[in-house]
Amino acid sequence: NLLAMQALLAGDEATGLSSLRGKVDLIYIDPPFDSKADYRTKINLPGVDIEQKPTVIEQFAYSDTWQDGTVSYLKMLYPRLVLMRELLSEKGRIYVHIDWHIGAYVKVIMDDVLGKENFKNEIIWKSAVGDTSNKNKKYIKSHDTIFFYNKIQGIQVWNDIFQEYSEKNKNAYRY
């Protein structure tokens, strides 16, 4: 039963992971980026009357600050990557989505945990075009990185998925 074999685990350190040791074919994580910021979500409430603009309440979403800075962040991430390596099957692969704040450090840790020889690719996820005007006077941060590793060297799984680009996308990414 294919549905019984597929599972999506969301959250941090879900219970019962030991039963999955060596059975997970694909892991994708999007951990915090060590941005040293607190994040809030906005909740729009309708105004009392038609003339009044909606009221906005900000609610705390999560904190991406670490007691000892980047060192604390890396100490949090390392054992989780070790656990994920143990969960991967022989043909398992892991994708770690990260940005410029911490990417270089995470790559070194992943090389240590999964082995440099198991690094397959650095996928660039273009996130925005950014302000390229002369007033900006700096390079724009316009992408995130997804590091891709196999558990074991030489084992490759590729499921070819092709979808024709729309004309709008063809024009936007014509280079």
Write out the residue ranges for each language-model feature.
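Core catalytic lobe of class I
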Residues: 1-175
